[in-house]
Amino acid sequence: MSRVAKAPVVLPAGVEVKLNGQEITIKGGKGELTRVLNNAVVVSQEDNSIVFGPREGVANAWAQAGTARALVNNMVVGVNEGFTKKLTLKGVGYRATMKGNAVGLTLGFSHPVEHALPEGIKAECPTQTEIIITGCDKQVVGQVAADIRSYRKPEPYKGKGVRYADEIVRTKEAKKK
């Protein structure tokens, strides 16, 4: 059995926590995040740490406590340091530009694609073939990166498309006559 929930989440300097029943709000330098935790989890704040435990009489309470601890830890890291995803475009004529609060993409379609960014997410294009997405909510940063990648996933023959910077695309060999 995993022991994730037994370790407390240590709060760095400059991070505030508000507990209101099962709702937890974490405020830091990069922003503020709120989440409602499962009823099977007991949450308490002790000094500069948050402690998680199972509620008595609930079957999967330890599993839920471990999940809650991981989610809250990601919230603390997000409001303190933030999260970043980097995408690269590979292909002839594939380009990315910033258009206000949207990312403009030229991906070989008959029309340009514009992806609007949700609140709290920033993107920048240091070059025409790179997109860097940053924000304090890990889930939203990952979802925006996945949405942009889904417009043109890397194809298996030449590897053209939008990919994560650390992604390895396995290429196939072309069919022989």
From Swiss-Prot:
KW Ribonucleoprotein (keyword) present: yes
GO terms of molecular function: rRNA binding; structural constituent of ribosome
Entries under InterPro entries matching the protein: Ribosomal_uL6-like, Ribosomal_uL6-like_a/b-dom_sf, Ribosomal_uL6_a/b-dom, Ribosomal_uL6_bac-type, Ribosomal_uL6_CS
PROSITE patterns given in the database record: RIBOSOMAL_L6_1
One GO CC annotation: cytosolic large ribosomal subunit
Matches recorded under HAMAP family: Ribosomal_uL6_B
Subunit structure: Part of the 50S ribosomal subunit.
Protein name, per record: Large ribosomal subunit protein uL6
Organism: Aliivibrio salmonicida (strain LFI1238) (Vibrio salmonicida (strain LFI1238))
Taxonomic lineage of the native organism: Bacteria, Pseudomonadati, Pseudomonadota, Gammaproteobacteria, Vibrionales
Encoding gene per record: rplF
